Amino acid sequence: GELVAPEEFKRRGALTLLKILLVQNRRPLSGDALMETLWPGAEPRAARNRLHVLVHSLRQAVEPPSRHRSWTYVCTRDGGYYLDATPSQYLDIEEFRSSIALGARAEKQGDYTRAATTYQTAIDLYRGDLFQGDPYAQWCWWEREHLRETVLDTLRRLSGLAAANGDWET
C-alpha cells in the first residue's frame, strides 16, 4: 500500500470514517451505527445520503484505480462497512492487539521470557492515546480508554514477570 496524506481526503469526514473503520478491527459497522456516530440525531434520509458521499470520498482516497465495482479496502458485508486491510498493510493497532494476545498466551503456558518479549513489543508500539488529533471525539473514547487500560495492565504484568525473575532494573 501507499501512504495517503490527510490532505488527499477531499472531505474531512472521510478521514474520520477511515479512523472509525480502523478501530473496528475488520468487523462490519452498520450504516445506521455509522450515521448515528457521525451525525447523532440527524434526519435518517439526509444522514444516509451524507454517508454514501463520505464512503465514496474515502474510496477515492484509499482505493486503487479500477474500472470494476469491487472494492479492495472499504468493503460492505452484512449491511455494514468495514476496512479490509490486507496482511501486506501494517496497522500498529492490530500489531498491538496481537502482541498482547500472544504475550497472554505465552504467560498462561508458563513461557515467561516469550511473554515478556511480546508484552514489551506491545508497549513499544503504544506511543500515546489513540487519535490524539481528535481529543474530544466521542466515537473513539471507549477504544482510547481500553487501549490505555490495556497498556497499564501490560506494564503491571511486565513488572510482575521481571520481579518474579529477580530483574529489579527493568
List each model region and its residues.
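Intrinsically disordered, low-complexity protein-interaction/activation regions
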Residues: 1-170
